[in-house]
């Protein structure tokens, strides 16, 4: 069994998602939410403040495509909390998280599993392989979405970038999973839809790689992965992983 541990990206690999964070309706709704809690934001003012605070927390971090620099990750709930405090409301973290979840629900146009996603994970676990999630994601959004999609119990471990302060392609994020789970790199494979973050990032720490070009993959040349799928086909991914 070559691939004893299978590491997956989430969005664009197992789950298809579309969010719209620029719609006037979203920011009008969120301004109403803040006003109900005593924070009198106007929609355009709120959006501008949100973007400013995100930028401040990111601290000018390099873009996801630059694999030569570290890639810090923020905790988005801090932004929602700061938006209350800028209007004089001493909001606790529980309210900030609930506000963040409302933002995510309102900005998500759809989220759904790709065909065969759950079946793939179940088959790998039934075969005795380790199944792990390593995703650039905000924990307050993604843990709720994993529960809604029924994926949480299908992983042996879930690693979300906002919990660790760094994100793919930063080698530290991959190494955290390998170290904490005592996984030798030569026994593991990374499956993802992003050539820079998933594939080249994984290769820097010695992982095998499977690339899937999905509907939300970055527009980039096909990467030099061990296996390259030019279209979404999780049944083919299952065959690759189970046969190795």
Model-derived features: where do they sit?
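Asp-based, Mg2+/Mn2+-dependent phosphohydrolase catalytic module
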Residues: 1-6, 16-20, 35-44, 94, ...
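Surface-exposed cleft-lining segments at the edges of enzyme active sites
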Residues: 102-111
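A short, well-structured juxtamembrane/interface segment
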Residues: 113-117
């Amino acid at each position: 069994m070559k691939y004893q541990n299978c590491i997956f990206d989430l969005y664009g690999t197992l789950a298809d998602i579309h969010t719209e964070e620029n719609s006037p309706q979203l920011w009008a709704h969120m301004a109403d939410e803040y006003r109900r809690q005593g924070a009198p934001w106007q929609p355009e003012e709120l959006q501008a403040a949100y973007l400013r605070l995100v930028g401040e927390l990111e601290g000018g971090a390099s873009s996801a495509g630059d694999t030569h620099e570290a890639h810090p990750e923020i905790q988005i709930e801090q932004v929602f909390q700061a938006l209350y405090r800028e209007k004089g409301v001493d909001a606790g973290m529980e309210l900030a998280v609930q506000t963040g979840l409302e933002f995510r629900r309102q900005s998500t146009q759809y989220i759904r599993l790709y065909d065969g996603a759950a079946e793939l994970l179940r088959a790998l676990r039934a075969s005795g392989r380790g199944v792990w999630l390593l995703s650039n994601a905000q924990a307050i959004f993604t843990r709720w979405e994993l529960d809604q999609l029924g994926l949480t119990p299908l992983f042996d471990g879930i690693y979300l970038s906002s919990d660790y302060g760094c994100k793919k392609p930063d080698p530290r994020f991959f190494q955290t999973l390998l170290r904490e789970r005592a996984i030798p790199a030569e026994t593991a494979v990374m499956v993802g839809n992003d050539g820079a973050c998933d594939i080249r990032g994984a290769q820097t720490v010695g992982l095998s790689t499977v690339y899937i070009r999905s509907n939300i993959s970055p527009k980039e040349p096909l990467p030099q992965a061990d296996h390259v799928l030019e279209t979404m086909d999780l049944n083919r991914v299952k065959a690759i992983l189970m046969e190795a």
